[in-house]
């Protein structure tokens, strides 16, 4: 049977899944270098212009309004006259050099056989996608990750799966693992452990890993995952009885978004989801993104520092979704993603699904570090607690677990976390 094809982004042509190509990687890297050089040139131009105008050290009240009107503008006018001509010439030269190098390499991209994936390469590309994934997608950069399902580090091939398991029988229960920000499917392999492989062997589940561009909006990835899972259920070699979902960090938000959007689209796969587990998921946001937004606002007060807010705007759509834990497009549409309060639509957990949440503190109980949760996600956010009743997820205490001395990434390998997962997911 055919492998599920990842859906294309809105306004984008469908992209075929392919293995890593060294030429594609080089082209993508060159595009990033050129784009970065152009952004730095623009930053220098803006700072130069402010110095030329002898602007007052603090900006007036209208500056905030200017910044709020556009995500990619700092409200500073472009240089004019000879100065502007020089900077435009530099920008044009950088663009021509970049386009020329890209054009020279393009014919070799398809001609050279794609190389095998490696954890090191994937870690770098996944990190780039987490920070700049929205830019990579909009600019057509080959480093942008198309959402796909994977197994054993390769795109899921259901035909091979059916043939390889013909003598043992194809599992009728699937464990879907959804990674977090700046991670890949290889990220589940940590310190000699993989929750997916271990739970799969113990419980007779087929572990399948989502691999996606974590720099895109959570709602975009949720919609794409919903469509891919509908195709997975249709193409699975035998009728599927059950889907169990395990989401780490942002992955839990993507899973929730996929379930909501799948229900709205009339998909059938949500009816097969019986259990949903969250590992350190920031259901109500993460303080580091809020700190980044606070720094952005402070920098915007001075016209001499304001050009540097362009650097803070490098935060991807996915990262800014983590400020409050956005799930739906309506949570971020209609305003600047860098200047908005929590205006999420309350999204309850799916009915008929047993939901579990694991949180942790990086320090010992009662230590100052315990106030920060696992180092990235506060305990209340990970457990779904909220002072507003409509936003509180209402996960039963018996379905919550709080560990201590466990960092955010160590949730992927800690023995106590695994034992808790095994206990919850084992048949009773």
Residue locations for each model-derived region?
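Flexible, membrane-associating and regulatory peripheral segments of lipid-active enzymes
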Residues: 2-209, 415-419, 423-428
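Helical cap/lid subdomain of alpha/beta-hydrolase-fold lipid enzymes
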Residues: 119, 125, 260-428
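Glycine-rich His-Gly loop
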Residues: 178-183, 248, 281, 360
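Short coil/turn segments at secondary-structure boundaries
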Residues: 188-191, 220-223, 259-260, 290-291
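Glycine- and acidic
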Residues: 206-214, 403-404
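Alpha/beta-hydrolase active-site loop
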Residues: 216-235
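Residue in the alpha/beta-hydrolase core beta-strand immediately N-terminal to the catalytic nucleophile
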Residues: 242-244, 257, 275-277
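Gly/Ala-rich beta-loop-alpha elbow adjacent to hydrolase catalytic centers
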Residues: 246-255
């Amino acid at each position: 049977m055919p492998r599920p094809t990842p859906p294309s982004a809105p306004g984008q042509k469908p992209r075929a899944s392919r293995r890593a190509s060294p030429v594609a990687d080089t082209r993508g890297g060159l595009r990033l270098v050129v784009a970065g050089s152009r952004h730095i040139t623009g930053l220098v131009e803006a700072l130069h212009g402010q110095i030329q105008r002898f602007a007052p050290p603090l900006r007036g009240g209208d500056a905030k309004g200017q910044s709020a009107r556009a995500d990619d503008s700092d409200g500073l006018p472009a240089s004019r006259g000879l100065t502007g001509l020089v900077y435009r010439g530099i920008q044009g030269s950088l663009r021509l050099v970049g386009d020329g190098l890209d054009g020279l390499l393009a014919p070799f991209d398809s001609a050279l056989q794609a190389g095998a994936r490696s954890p090191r390469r994937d870690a770098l590309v996944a990190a780039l996608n987490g920070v700049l994934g929205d830019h990579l997608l909009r600019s057509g950069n080959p480093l942008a990750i198309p959402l796909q399902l994977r197994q054993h580090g390769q795109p899921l091939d259901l035909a091979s799966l059916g043939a390889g398991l013909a003598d043992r029988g194809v599992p009728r229960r699937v464990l879907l693992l959804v990674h977090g920000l700046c991670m890949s499917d290889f990220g589940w392999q940590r310190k000699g452990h993989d929750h997916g492989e271990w739970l799969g062997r113990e419980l007779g589940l087929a572990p399948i890993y989502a691999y996606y561009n974590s720099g895109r909006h959570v709602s975009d990835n949720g919609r794409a995952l919903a469509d891919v899972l509908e195709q997975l259920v249709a193409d699975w070699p035998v009728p599927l009885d059950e889907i169990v979902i395990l989401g780490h960090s942002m992955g839990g938000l993507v899973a929730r978004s996929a379930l909501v959007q799948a229900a709205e689209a009339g998909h059938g796969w949500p009816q097969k989801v019986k259990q949903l587990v969250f590992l350190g998921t920031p259901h109500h946001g993460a303080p580091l993104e809020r700190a980044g937004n606070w720094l952005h606002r402070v920098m915007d007060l001075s016209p001499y520092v304001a050009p540097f807010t362009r650097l803070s705007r490098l935060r991807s759509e996915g990262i800014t979704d983590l400020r409050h834990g956005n799930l739906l497009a309506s949570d971020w549409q209609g305003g600047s993603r860098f200047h908005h309060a929590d205006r999420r639509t309350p999204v309850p957990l799916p009915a008929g699904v047993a939901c579990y949440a694991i949180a942790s503190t990086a320090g010992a109980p009662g230590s100052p570090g315990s106030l920060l949760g696992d180092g990235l996600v506060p305990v209340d956010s990970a457990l779904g607690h909220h002072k507003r009743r409509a936003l509180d997820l209402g996960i039963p205490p018996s379905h919550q677990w709080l560990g201590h001395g466990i960092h955010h990434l160590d949730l992927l390998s800690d023995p106590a976390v695994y034992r808790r997962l095994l206990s919850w997911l084992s048949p009773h």
